[in-house]
């Protein structure tokens, strides 16, 4: 499984948000395919946490690219973001939905749900995504359905597919950011067309 390098994240946030689709989020033995993301472009983006300036809560956003920004909402759900662009730019990509691939149980069609299913909590905030137990990788496995648990499992680990899996990307406004004035209408949510695990069409 080829881990994404730092340079992948140190690029335009919209590009990263689109190209994270189809990649694998790995936490320990749990694996899920990213099928929906949202881009948050920095302090000028009124929907972004960084628009309020640097705080203890959002400090990870101001750090180097390729780190996790994990925060809690409603006092009970965690959301995971991936920090993008240069250090201090304060932009990130929210992971909104995953397709379960290996040893993932429970719903994954929402940012809080996917964190719960993947065992992600605030202890992973500011975690380097180039580590060994929590990272994002290219999908270079050949998978099959496991009839007993209705999960995917690798049948040819490490065997590269002859061509990357292709899919159509849909763009929509982000969810739950009505307060962000004109930024609420920007099409900065991306998902894989036709995927059953997307949080909202």
Region locations from a protein language model:
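Conserved, well-structured core segments that form or line functional sites
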Residues: 1-144, 148-154, 158-201
């Amino acid at each position: 499984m080829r881990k994404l390098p730092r340079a992948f994240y140190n690029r335009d946030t919209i590009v990263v948000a689109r190209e994270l689709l189809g990649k694998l989020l790995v936490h320990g033995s749990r694996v899920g395919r990213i099928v929906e993301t949202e881009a948050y472009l920095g302090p000028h983006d009124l929907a972004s946490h960084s628009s309020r300036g640097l705080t203890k809560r959002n400090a990870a956003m101001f750090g180097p690219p390729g780190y996790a920004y994990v925060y809690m909402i409603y006092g009970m759900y965690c959301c995971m973001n991936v920090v993008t662009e240069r250090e201090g730019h304060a932009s990130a990509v929210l992971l909104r939905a995953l397709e379960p691939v290996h040893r993932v149980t429970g719903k994954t069609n929402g940012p809080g749900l996917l964190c719960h299913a993947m065992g992600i909590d605030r202890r992973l905030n500011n975690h380097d995504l180039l580590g060994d137990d929590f990272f994002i990788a290219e999908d270079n496995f050949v998978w099959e359905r496991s009839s007993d648990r209705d999960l995917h499992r690798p049948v040819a680990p490490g065997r590269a597919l002859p061509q990357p899996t292709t899919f159509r990307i849909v763009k929509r406004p982000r969810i739950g950011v009505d307060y962000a004035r004109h930024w609420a209408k920007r099409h900065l949510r991306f998902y894989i067309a036709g995927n059953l695990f997307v949080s909202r069409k």
